[in-house]
Amino acid sequence: TLLATNRWAKALFIDIATGNTRPVPFNSEQIISLLIDKKGNVWVAHYNQGVSCYDRNGKQLQTYHTQNSPLKTNVVLSLEEHNGQIWMGTDGGGIHILNPQTGKISTLRYIPGDRYSLPANSILCLYNDKSDNMWAGSVRNGLINIKEVGMKTYQDVLPGQNYGLSEKTILSIYQDHDNQIWIGTDGGGINLFDPATGKFHHILSTWEEKVASITGMDKDHLLVSLFSQGLFLS
């Protein structure tokens, strides 16, 4: 069963075997991002309402917004879990990192003149890879690899070059069974990144596509969501 959301519409459970759908047991209006954490709780970012946490039965456990927490903005665009903490990519406020046990929130953000700060403050997607490194897809500032020891940013390059992206706005990220990282861009199609070599492969057949989401179905297949076109099994 998949938990899926159509941005600005409602979330649904989808039975992969039958294609049947059923509603979720929590408020699913205007959902921007969803995350199921390791405890099975569901974190939901509703547009301009911060972030709420629900148990698997739909009971609201907690909500975080600018009025009751250190969250700097209520527009949260992406959610990911890393070492038991909830990372929140925001629209203009950088990355907020929540400790669910204490409610404490720390922030990574762009600081003008500080080359060690986050390169961008609008983060559309977050991904925790198998090496426990974080990846952030930004608005017009490329792909950011965040490690304990520092950050590295990958920008767009000219067609045919393999040391950068086909498009600098990143919508989705997924690491496959072979540790290759699939990157969905906003109009540049799908890029495949090899962390071992640092090289990118631009998949030309997807050029100009807006790749809203990528995830794995099994070790040989990906499920890809293209903007305004639906889901595709690849």
Task: Mark where each language-model region is.
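Carboxylate-rich, polar loop motifs that coordinate divalent cations or form catalytic acidic clusters
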Residues: 1-234
